């Protein structure tokens, strides 16, 4: 079972590239983007994943403008054997230049949503800390992820209007991840497992001449499982980004977080992240949300279009909803990203704060 990538010297096992190194049913490979205006007037998200052992390739595109509805396109198909085939019906992703430029196209379809967008990077690729989570003696997540910060150029149309996306304004975050992650239909059979929980917070932020990045996985009692903070140079154009700039990434000793929530919700009203240097210096970043995006619009915790679930040989769907009118404590609505204004007391910037938590003891709500 060969595909086009087998012509490159990239193999990590004796098998062709189509064969995963693990037989875990939840092995996956994912491409994800966001894009947003610094003033919080709009936000859009993009996702595509292949789940080889589930036989699924799925995608989503979702856009929201301030004080308007969020519009969502979903697509799913039988996973192709050819890994360079990154298309689901009217949706496709084209890697124009690896680690630099990616095109995303959603052609005319029944949702009334379409786009033609080009991402171009403004940072080197940034590899995050390894993300390994356990349930007893079993790894339920084991993933590598890298990020890039950049810009978008192109157009978006949705049922409530059109957006002209200009790279002089529109900021972008890209992440690529692969490994094992629990998705799709839940497993059945076997002995019941003990309840646990997770708290996740991610803050990719733009400043004038650099980016800052922090990621947190905490356990049900607030114990740190994964924590990382870093900074890296931000370039004015894609052409200025060096091919080999990994040494320019400055990893901090660690990071910490504090989140204040709107009463009776799991939606952040404000937050702070501390980047703690190797010299014990502390850079405190204060974040103020200005726009909310519901991650179920990309399939996360969606009751019908959850990632990795079998929908059929080729299916597409769509929906629109007002994020302000949703039940904030419904399971499908507690995963969100918020565009945030940020300040460290000397500099100001903008970025995104993502969070989700399912925990037995809600220690940070007390």
Show which residues each predicted segment covers:
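Structured soluble/peripheral alpha/beta segments that form catalytic or ligand/cofactor-binding pockets
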Residues: 1-366
